[in-house]
Amino acid sequence: MTLKKLTLPELLKNSCSKFSKNLSLNFVASGKKTYQDLYNEVVSIANHLLHLGVKKGDKVAILSANMPNWGITQFAIANIGAIAVPVLPGFCSTELQNILEHAEVKVIFVSRLLAKCLEGVKTPFLEHKILINNFSTTDSYTHLRAH
């Protein structure tokens, strides 16, 4: 059997077209999501990243423990051709500063539990901090979800 070579966005879109009503995620805290729900959320977050000025090749960091929104964020970043920079949750502020600056990260998605780690972290590139728990920006708390 020959497998097609697909990008992450193509893989998700194909899965959605074949299995749109099937369950894709099921977590106690966030409930159930079908492939169509997942795809819609990925496209919504991807569109908001574009609205924030993120372009193909820009770096977007993810600082969070495992959660459904981590995967949604990864797919959204890939969907617009940006580069995901996953950051280990155990890093301290100094390490975060170095990683974000060296990678020239433009946007970071951070979990509420780890947001304090970013206090004092400033780089000439970082423009937006977004809470991954509910996809709101930490500076204005404008919700990114189209609910």
For each feature predicted by the language model, list its residue ranges.
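Proline-centered helix-kink/hinge sites
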Residues: 20, 68, 86, 145-147
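Structural core segment of the AMP-binding/adenylate-forming
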Residues: 11, 52, 79-144
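Conserved AMP-binding/adenylate-forming core of the ANL superfamily
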Residues: 4, 13, 21-67, 71-75, ...
